[in-house]
């Protein structure tokens, strides 16, 4: 008879300290789906289902109980919080596990707190399903990524008062066709934008157009300036900035290589763009893609560059449609709850979880964090 392994306790938080973040990790209507054997280890924050019209009384007998945030942070082994900020980690005790989107590579403060407090960070953004040969198959939270593209386009077009269905015809360029790009094209098509060009670094013949009216074109790094790009079309090689200047809406959906980032448009390129052009930076990384790039917030979602060119870069745009986003996050997360609560041995036996651990007991596991933040390889990973 096998030895029964004690499960870790998990605290599922209902509120983020990130302004206007409304997504939850488990949809209140999905709590019934939690395996019976896991429920004694699952604790929810008071008011967990409030925004969804689900009272605590309806959830109480389906989990170990509902408790205040401070009690969950003090007592639970694992904290599930989709969008943590540095202050959340400051409230955690040494040795705890955080499961969410920490984005450690670009976030030195969160990384340092995890090191100092010997935390383990299991990153949603690094959770992938893998093929039998060890190759990448699909991102676990791809539907949330689609929603990022969808919500960013929806919100930005609303803020600028435009739609393709009415008013002058609009043309849009979407850079990259992963899940984020598919969501962006879905929104553009739904909003009546018919002239959509999708730019991909893959072979055009290997890429299916995401919409009947979309045209797929190829781009690649400029051999003479690898940080810049060229578009290969019927007229030969064209600098990407010049190509993009022919569109009313430009949507960036590129997952940047932080070690060799791409630059699509700089301030020097802006005079070629028509006033009123809208740039939607879904996959915003500060200083990458656009020379002025920086994340924005729901409180101040856009700013103007050049001659009245709008720039949108809300870094958690799926929170716009928080109920639908919560549903998709929950669908993706629940199959991995057992492995996470199983503790270190269970993590190591599950490839998706094992490879999503960015920091383990304070020790950095992802080399990209070390290189981007210029840290030493050995704990405590001082900045070099």
Please tell me what each predicted stretch does.
Residues 39-40, 93-97, 116-119, 193, ...:
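A short helix->loop->beta-strand "cap" motif at the edges of active sites that frequently abuts
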Residues 2-9, 13-15, 87-171, 314-316:
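Glycine/serine-rich phosphate-binding loop and adjoining beta1-alpha1 elements at the start
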Residues 83-84, 102-103, 254-258, 283-284, ...:
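Short glycine-/small-residue-rich Rossmann-like dinucleotide-binding loops
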Residues 205-307:
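Rossmann-like adenosine-cofactor binding region
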Residues 125-127, 131-166, 278, 283-384:
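Adenosine-phosphate binding glycine-rich loop
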Residues 14-51, 155-249:
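Glycine-rich phosphate/diphosphate-binding loop of Rossmann-like nucleotide-binding domains
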Residues 2, 6-113:
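An N-terminal-biased, well-structured beta-alpha scaffold segment characteristic
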């Amino acid at each position: 008879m096998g030895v029964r392994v004690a499960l870790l306790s998990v605290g599922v938080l209902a509120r983020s300290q990130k302004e206007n973040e409304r997504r939850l990790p488990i949809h209140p209507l999905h709590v019934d789906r939690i395996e019976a054997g896991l429920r004694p280890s699952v604790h929810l924050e008071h008011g967990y289902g409030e925004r969804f019209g689900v009272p605590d009384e309806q959830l109480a007998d389906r989990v170990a109980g509902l408790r205040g945030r401070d009690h969950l942070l003090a007592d639970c082994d694992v904290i599930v919080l989709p969008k943590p900020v540095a202050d959340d980690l400051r409230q955690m005790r040494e040795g705890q596990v955080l499961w969410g989107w920490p984005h450690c590579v670009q976030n030195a403060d969160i990384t340092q707190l995890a090191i100092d407090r010997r935390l383990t960070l299991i990153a949603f953004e690094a959770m992938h399903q893998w093929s039998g040969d060890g190759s990448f198959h699909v991102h676990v939270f791809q539907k949330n990524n689609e929603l990022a593209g969808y919500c960013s386009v929806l919100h930005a077009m609303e803020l600028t008062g435009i739609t393709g269905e009415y008013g002058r015809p609009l043309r849009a360029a979407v850079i990259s066709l992963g899940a984020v790009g598919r969501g962006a094209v879905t929104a553009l098509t739904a909003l009546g934008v018919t002239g959509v060009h999708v730019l991909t670094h893959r072979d055009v013949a290997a890429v299916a157009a995401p919409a009947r009216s979309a045209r797929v074109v190829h781009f690649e790094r400029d051999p003479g300036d690898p940080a810049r790009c060229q578009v290969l079309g019927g007229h030969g090689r064209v600098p990407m900035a010049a190509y993009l200047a022919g569109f009313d809406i430009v949507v960036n959906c590129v997952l940047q290589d932080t070690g060799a980032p791409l630059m699509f448009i700089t301030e020097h390129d802006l005079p070629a763009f028509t006033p009123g052009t809208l740039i939607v930076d879904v996959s915003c990384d500060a200083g990458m893609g656009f020379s002025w790039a920086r994340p924005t917030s729901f409180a101040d979602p856009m700013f103007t560059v050049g001659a009245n060119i709008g720039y949108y870069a809300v870094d958690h745009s799926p929170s716009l449609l928080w109920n639908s986003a919560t549903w998709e996050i929950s669908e993706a997360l629940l199959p991995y709850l057992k492995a996470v609560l199983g503790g270190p041995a269970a993590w190591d036996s599950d490839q998706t979880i094992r490879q999503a651990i960015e920091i383990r007991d304070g020790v950095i596991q992802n080399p990209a964090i070390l290189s981007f933040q210029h840290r030493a390889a050995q704990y405590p990973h001082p900045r070099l």
